[in-house]
Amino acid sequence: MDAIILAGGFAKRMWPLTKNKPKQLLNLAGKPMLDYVFDSLDNLDFERIIVSVNSFFAPQFQEHLSSNSKDKKIELFIEESTNENEKLGALGALNLLFKKKKMAGPVFIAGGDNLSDFDLIKMIDLYEKSNSDVIGLFDVENIELAKLYGIANLEGNRIIDFVEKPSSPPSTLAATAYWLLSESGINNFFTYIEGGGDRDAMGNFLTWNVKRNPVLSVSFKGSWYDIGGLESYSEAQNWLEKRP
C-alpha cells in the first residue's frame, strides 16, 4: 500500500507566514509540520510515501527532503500550479496523481496539515478485514463545534450520510483528513470526477460516495488539529510543546 500526503495548497488564510513558505514546512515545537505527519505514518509500512505539492513551493520541499529525510520511500509529486488561481484542489490533485502514477489502490491519504495522536493502524486493520474504504473520524463532543466541520452519520461503523458544516448536525463525528481508498474506492473516485464532481473539498466526494458505496469509519479519541488558520496553528503549537 502507498500513502499520499496532500500539501499542495497555498494557505492564504495564514499569510504572511505562508506567503513565501509552505504551511507544511512551518516550524511547530522545534520541527516542520510535515515531519510530524511523517512520524504518524512511520509504523504503517507503506511501500511509498508520496508528498503532493504545488510547483511554486516544490523547491523548498525538495530541499527539506534532501537535507532531512533518509527515507528512500518518500518522493515528491509536483502539481502544475504556481498560484492560488491555478490550484487543482485536493481532489483535482489526487485525480492527477492517481493517473500519472497509475495507482489502482489501496492507498492511504493524509492531509499535510492534520496533526494527531491517533493510532492510524486501526484504519488499515479495518480495511484488511472489510476491503472497503475507511475514513478517520474524530468526536468533537459539541454540537455547536460540529457545525464547523464535515459531519458523519453512522449505522454501526458505516457512514450512511455526510454533510459539510450542517446547521443541525446529525452527530458530533467530524471527518479528518485521514482516508483509505480501496481499489473499488479509486474506481468510484474516477466515476465521481468524470461525472463533473467538485474537485476542491474532499468532503464533497465523501457526500457522494457514501450514498453509493460502503464507506466504513474508525472513530478516534485523543487530540486532532486541522491547521487551517493562525488560531489552529497556535493551538497545535501549544499541544506539541506540552506533550511528554
Predicted features along the sequence, with ranges:
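N-terminal nucleotide-binding beta1-loop-alpha1 segment
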Residues: 1-20, 26, 44, 214
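Conserved N-terminal catalytic core of the sugar/cofactor nucleotidyltransferase
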Residues: 2-5, 13, 31-110, 122
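Active-site metal-binding loops of divalent metal-dependent hydrolases
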Residues: 10, 112-114
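Residue-level signal for inorganic ion chemistry
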Residues: 34, 97, 113, 152, ...
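Catalytic-core segments of class I nucleotidyltransferases/pyrophosphorylases
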Residues: 108, 115, 124-128, 158-244
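Conserved donor-nucleotide/metal-binding helix-loop-beta segment in metal-dependent transferases, i.e.
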Residues: 118-146
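Anionic-ligand binding region
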Residues: 141-169
